[in-house]
Swiss-Prot record:
Domain of life: Bacteria
GO biological process, one term: iron-sulfur cluster assembly
Lineage: Bacteria, Pseudomonadati, Pseudomonadota, Gammaproteobacteria, Methylococcales
Keyword ATP-binding: yes
Organism: Methylococcus capsulatus (strain ATCC 33009 / NCIMB 11132 / Bath)
Protein name per Swiss-Prot or TrEMBL: Chaperone protein HscA homolog
Keyword set includes Chaperone: yes
Pfam families from the UniProt entry: HSP70
Its job: Chaperone involved in the maturation of iron-sulfur cluster-containing proteins. Has a low intrinsic ATPase activity which is markedly stimulated by HscB.
Length: 619
């Protein structure tokens, strides 16, 4: 949300600091700034504001970026990298969905790398080259060094992907004020420019990812109600649909890398022309001299991509459900991303939301404009009425508790930055260490969530079970990066960890984690109840058996027999999977041992008072 506060170090400065907003996109990238109170996108020497997110490695240290690299893509596909954003923070095992890519993938340290004529190159390095060009463009246009930048990322980027983006910026010589979710950046641009109020949906279909955000806009306040999306769906998939159609029309298959790249470029061009005209003709000559000639109509294109269009609406429904809203509650729909220029997208969005979507701002530029506004604020250039934008985390962050349960500490869709704390205690007498397992996900059992990190808190003073107080704090910063601290309250002993996963979630995992939380909600609740009852039953059994060992002599034979029988029934119930049966057996044992507990208390008091004089007791 937007609040009347400022981040540390972002106060008003006596002189204006140069700051930019960068949309590091899958297909194109842009850089924008606030100049003379106007937010503008900066162009190159030829006046072009869009920089193709394409990098070509020539060897001997030579590199081409942007239009030059894109022009050579067809003839040198193995060394020319497009849509590299899809590989940020990913491991080799995550690339199953990227069949057909012409690159030579190799496993790197925590992230996939590309084998090129210039050696092994990581997606971070490729992204850094794009950022360098944007940085140089801004420096030349603004006439000075940059104080920093706000860089946008898809809302569904996890910690590893966000960290990879920050690493790329560092390589490019950029100070990152913060990372900002792309749909949220668009909302900043639309909300501030139009002073709009109400609940809005931001439909963001970029080259490689799809995001939907539901935001509540009021005067001076932007609150993100919910986010959802598909990290493996974007304009590239629509290009591929045209590509597959062209292959089918020509009867060809098994094209060489260069021919496949050439045809994919032609497919993208045809798709873009169909946004302006009703037909597009493809006429492409392959390396063997054969030609692929076909005319694609807008209607046929709509049929080819109907499944993809429909696929975008599933996350939209989930986001509305998460926000507790109906379609009628949405005042307007903002379109973001060049892919939203397609008529089939605009028609589908209009039909779903029963209203014409907003297209006042250029969908290619709107994200960069919003990022520039935020950068201007964080640079300290905006005096009076400053606002701060807070995003939300897309997946819940939790901790493993006894029985393999996931205790959610920061629920999904919580606004960030945020700090949440919860107290835990020890399970055994004299316990001096505790293992902290940090997890991410929506399921009730840790086995169904994603493990982020493990660390230990040592040096806990020996106490009776349940006496120690361990406070676990989760801090998520404005970039979505997590720090976890565990501290024992009486001694002050502390342990902490910064969570930076070695690589990110696969495309399938990101979509599955939220989907499964809905599909298995009832089963998960039953599983959680079962584990909770088993944990409580185990505690009761241990306590009862310990009491019988120490003070069993306080019971009659008949009373002892009742408690032993109760223990046997509870242990038998624990071998099954009926949580209610375990609870009933535990309740029965508790009730049967109530009188015994009272006698033990009386016995302990009597033993403590034996031999004491009244004066020593203050009587």
């Amino acid at each position: 949300m937007l609040l009347q506060i400022s981040e540390p170090g972002a106060g008003v400065k006596p002189q204006r600091r140069l700051a930019v907003g960068i949309d590091l996109g899958t297909t194109h990238s842009l850089v924008a700034t606030v100049r003379d109170e106007q937010t503008v996108v900066l162009g190159d020497a030829q006046g072009r504001v869009l920089l193709p997110s394409v990098v070509r490695y020539l060897g001997a240290g030579a590199i081409e970026v942007g239009y030059e690299a894109k022009a050579r893509q067809a003839e040198d596909p193995e060394n020319t990298f497009v849509s590299v954003k899809r590989y940020m923070g990913r491991g080799l095992g995550d690339l199953a969905s990227h069949h057909g890519a012409p690159y030579r993938f190799v496993e790197g340290e925590g992230m996939v790398q590309f084998d090129t004529r210039a050696g092994r190159i990581s997606p971070v390095q490729v992204s850094a080259e794009i950022l360098k060009v944007l940085r140089d463009r801004a420096v030349a246009e603004l006439g000075g060094e940059l104080a920093g930048a706000v860089i946008t990322v898809p809302a569904y980027f996890d910690e590893a992907q966000r960290q990879a983006t920050k690493d790329a910026a560092k390589l490019a010589g950029l100070e990152v004020f913060r990372l900002l979710n792309e749909p949220t950046a668009a909302a900043v641009a639309y909300g501030l420019d139009n002073a709009a109020e109400g609940v809005y949906a931001v439909y963001d279909l970029g080259g490689g990812t799809f995001d939907i955000s539901v935001l509540k806009l009021t005067r001076g306040v932007f609150e993100v109600l919910a986010t959802n999306g598909d990290p493996a769906l974007g304009g590239d998939d629509f290009d591929r649909a045209v590509y597959d159609w062209l292959l089918a029309q020509s009867g060809l298959n098994g094209l060489s890398s260069s021919d496949a790249s050439l045809l994919l470029t032609a497919s993208r061009a045809a798709k873009e022309r169909l946004s302006e005209q009703t037909e597009a003709t493809v006429d492409t000559m392959l390396s063997d001299g054969s030609r692929i000639v076909a005319t694609l109509s807008r209607d046929t294109f709509a049929e080819l991509t109907a499944g993809l269009v429909k696929k975008t609406l599933t996350p939209v429904r989930k986001a509305l459900r998460d926000a507790g809203l109906a379609i009628d509650d949405i005042k307007g729909v903002v379109l973001v991303g060049g892919a939203t220029r397609m008529p089939c997208i605009r028609e589908a969005v209009a039909e779903f939301f029963q209203q014409t979507p907003l297209t006042d701002l250029d969908p290619d530029k709107v994200v960069a404009l919003g990022a520039a506004m935020q950068a201007n604020l964080l640079a300290g250039n905006r005096a009076g009425g400053d606002w701060l934008l807070l995003d939300v985390i897309p997946l819940s962050l939790g901790i493993e508790t006894l029985g393999g349960l996931c205790e959610k500490i920061v629920p999904r869709n919580t606004t960030i930055p945020v700090a949440r704390a919860q107290e835990f205690t020890t399970w055994k007498d004299g316990q001096t260490a505790m293992s902290i397992h940090v997890v991410q996900g929506e399921r009730e059992l840790v086995s169904e969530c994603r493990s982020l990190a493990r660390f230990e808190l040592r040096g806990i003073p020996p106490m009776a079970a349940g006496a120690a107080r361990i406070r676990v704090t989760y801090q998520v910063d404005a970039d979505g990066l997590l720090n976890v601290t565990a501290a024992e309250q009486t001694s002050g002993v502390e342990a902490r960890i910064e969570v930076k996963p070695s690589y990110g979630l696969s495309d399938a995992e990101v979509a599955r984690m939220i989907e499964d939380s809905y599909l298995h909600a009832r089963d998960d609740l039953e599983a959680r109840r079962l584990q909770e009852q088993k944990v409580e039953a185990a505690r009761l059994i241990e306590a009862t058996e310990s009491a019988l060992t120490e003070d069993g002599g306080l019971l009659t034979e008949q009373e002892l027999e009742v408690l032993v029988k109760g223990l046997q029934v509870l242990k038998g119930a624990m071998e099954g999977s009926d949580w209610q049966a375990i609870k009933n057996a535990a309740d029965a044992l508790n009730e049967a041992s109530t009188e015994f507990a009272g006698r033990r208390m009386d016995h302990s008091i009597k033993a403590a008072l034996t031999g004491q004089k009244l004066e020593s007791l203050g009587v």
